[in-house]
Curated annotation (Swiss-Prot):
Interacts with IGF2BP1. Interacts with MAP1B light chain LC1. The modification Phosphoserine is found at residue 221. Belongs to the RRM elav family. Residues 1-33 are annotated as: Disordered. Residues 39-117, 125-205, 276-354 form the RRM domain. The lineage of its organism: Eukaryota, Metazoa, Chordata, Craniata, Vertebrata. Brain; neural-specific. GO terms for biological process: regulation of DNA-templated transcription. It comes from Homo sapiens (Human). One of its GO terms (cellular component) is ribonucleoprotein complex. RNA-binding protein that binds to the 3' untranslated region (3'UTR) of target mRNAs. Seems to recognize a GAAA motif. Can bind to its own 3'UTR, the FOS 3'UTR and the ID 3'UTR. This is ELAV-like protein 2.
């Protein structure tokens, strides 16, 4: 049975607060553990393009640092938006919290607090949330989930052109048990302002280990004819040479779908004005948007992903679309992913044409 949920705990912290803000939030979002280390800090809501050296430089201005680590995705190498800074002197750590917590960096307002010691209980606590109301803000998302535990990071995916929410978000809890409780309490429920129930699940739960292994092969496998995006950055091939190699040698026999042509069809479709649309065919019935984000994200800026689902079963109909802002990045993604085996299926990836499947 669907249940209409009430708002969670409220907090008077704002995303656009001053450089130093008061932590007056009573929810677990900003709770610290006074019994833990007084030198090790966790820094949340870092800009996606911030490097570890920049993080170290920022916090090194406060005092001498023993260690600094920007946490990255093990598969893609992309920043997860948070990191750890360990000072030598506890006084410097306290000063860093007082000085840098609430600092505005680009479009982010960072959060600095004492870190908990690493343990098995805090791993795999990242949740994938879909079906969110398009009007829901990141603060409201945190309020909804904060009743279940301490939130490390949160994110709502938005269209980079319009700025409108895609109705999809991520919540990373301090502990896995907190994430499990959030799934029990919120999955299939209706948050305030929603007309449909939301879906809450682990971003990388046990049932997705196969996909994770596949994606790992995509970026790391030495047996791939064409290296993944991380390896490509180290190659000295120009993009045009790579494309010539990718499509000059037939890697498999692509089927023709409704007259659809691949990039090898010579004619590249025109730019639609909002990005380059890529058609992805032969997806599995249980494929979802998160797989497309993980596959295409490392190649460049992705503004939209969409898996086309059957109206009656809500299962993937076998294809989807990915929109990227940059042509070269989109072409590179196609060169690497067209003909790639995802599970027991060989993907067909091409620029969308007028004859491509329609949603």
């Amino acid at each position: 049975m669907e249940t209409q949920l009430s708002n969670g705990p409220t907090c008077n912290n704002t995303a656009n607060g001053p450089t130093t803000i008061n932590n007056n939030c009573s929810s677990p979002v900003d709770s610290g553990n006074t019994e833990d280390s007084k030198t090790n800090l966790i820094v949340n809501y870092l800009p996606q393009n911030m490097t570890q050296e920049e993080l170290k430089s920022l916090f090194g201005s406060i005092g001498e640092i023993e260690s600094c680590k920007l946490v990255r995705d093990k598969i893609t190498g992309q920043s997860l938006g948070y990191g750890f800074v360990n000072y030598i002197d506890p006084k410097d750590a306290e000063k860093a919290i007082n000085t840098l917590n609430g600092l505005r960096l680009q479009t982010k307002t960072i959060k600095v607090s004492y870190a908990r010691p690493s343990s098995a209980s805090i791993r795999d606590a990242n949740l994938y949330v879909s079906g969110l109301p398009k009007t829901m803000t990141q603060k409201e998302l945190e309020q909804l989930f904060s009743q279940y535990g301490r939130i490390i990071t949160s994110r709502i995916l938005v269209d980079q052109v319009t700025g409108i929410s895609r109705g999809v978000g991520f919540i990373r809890f301090d502990k896995r048990i907190e994430a499990e409780e959030a799934i029990k309490g919120l999955n299939g429920q209706k948050p305030p302002g929603a007309t449909e129930p939301i879906t809450v699940k682990f971003a990388n739960n046990p049932s997705q280990k196969t996909n994770q292994a596949i994606l790992s092969q995509l970026y790391q496998s030495p047996n791939r004819r064409y290296p993944g995006p991380l390896a490509q950055q180290a190659q000295r091939f120009r993009l045009d040479n790579l494309l010539n190699m990718a499509y000059g040698v037939k890697r498999f026999s692509p089927m023709t779908i409704d007259g659809m042509t691949s990039l090898a069809g010579i004619n590249i479709p025109g730019h639609p004005g909002t990005g380059w649309c890529i058609f992805v065919y032969n997806l599995a019935p249980d494929a979802d948007e998160s797989i497309l984000w993980q596959m295409f994200g490392p190649f460049g800026a992705v503004t939209n992903v969409k898996v086309i689902r059957d109206f009656n079963t809500n299962k993937c109909k076998g294809f989807g679309f990915v929109t990227m802002t940059n042509y070269d990045e989109a072409a590179m993604a196609i060169a690497s992913l067209n003909g790639y085996r995802l599970g027991d299926r060989v993907l067909q990836v091409s620029f969308k044409t007028n004859k491509t499947h329609k949603a």
